[in-house]
Amino acid sequence: MNKLPSNIEILIVSIILIIGCQKKNEINSSFQPIALSIDLPYNFPVIEHPIDNPLTEQGVLLGRHLFWETKLSGDNSISCASCHLPENAFSDPSSLSVGIHGDLGTRNAMVLQNLAWSKDFFWDGSFISLEKQILIPVLDSTEMDETWSNFFTEIKHDNNYRRMFYEAFGTVEPDSIHAVKAIAQFLRTMVSSNSKYDKYLRGEAVLTPEENAGLSSFNSLNGGDCFHCHGGILGTDLSFKNNGLDEIPIDSGRGIVTRETKDNFKFKVPSIRNIEYSAPYMHDGRFNTLDEVIDFYSIGIHPNSPNIDPLIEFASQGGVQLNPKERSELKSFLLTLSDPDFINNTKFSNPF
């Protein structure tokens, strides 16, 4: 004869089930994020971090893992780092990046350095938040072609990720907002500030005569005339300009975003820091070498390019007309902007 379970037996079974569920969801950790600050040289501007996404040790660690995570792509073949390689100052050595389906992107992958001071992202400034910008490559069918929901389904039972998300954000049910915040935190720690030129400014290094001549040319209206757009410690004024690349441009650039005719064919002024490592150059990666870039500004500017920036003061004569010696000197100075400590920093390397 079957005996009905007693109330005590039912209670015991219920407790066992509850404990089993708890163990399944248990995170062997605690939510105690540790604030992280970045040590900056005295001559760098203060970083204003978003109020809703302050730097923490746990958030940066999670972001580093996600930056290198191939599961963020539809076929698990590429990560953010696939198009932003450390040895290339976290840019792509190809003119246009290749997505998981073999499709080419439309613009060159930008360098990831000193993003903590940027207010606009992508070549056309289509996003004013680093967090929002990070959402896009994962979803873009020509790039990673994945959905954030698929990614979180895939890592649902990954105890390492469960622990890291909990330690960073105090949740066992993370979503894309948590992920992009973590990646943004990681990217904001990627500060380049220890080139030879930085050391020179701090009195820790001496420039050679050729490098000094290049620096003078860089800052001279009658020389390279580079300082208008690339002066300052960041190597960019963070503005959008048309530098006269084409007589008849194809890509409308900033104008696509603002829908203002005056912004057509303008692109974000890239930083010249680590320019030695970040070839190819320009928004479409048209120049393969630094020499080609210097030659362009010397003799290759198209003066009739629509909306050419007025700061390109020598456009009417095709450029600043540097002679071979002056070009060599300018290049020597630009190479002092290389920061090997940045590209070799193990804090940015693959954690897997």
Named regions from a protein language model:
Residues 91, 140, 158, 193-194, ...:
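Short alpha-helix boundary/capping motifs
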Residues 2-60, 136, 145-212, 216, ...:
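Post-cleavage N-terminal segment of exported redox proteins
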Residues 306-318, 322:
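C-terminal soluble interaction/assembly domains
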Residues 130, 141-146:
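Mobile amphipathic helical/loop "lid" adjacent to a hydrophobic cofactor/ligand pocket
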Residues 264, 282, 318-326:
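Short amphipathic alpha-helical interaction segments
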Residues 26-136, 198-309, 343-352:
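Short glycine/threonine-rich turn/loop motifs
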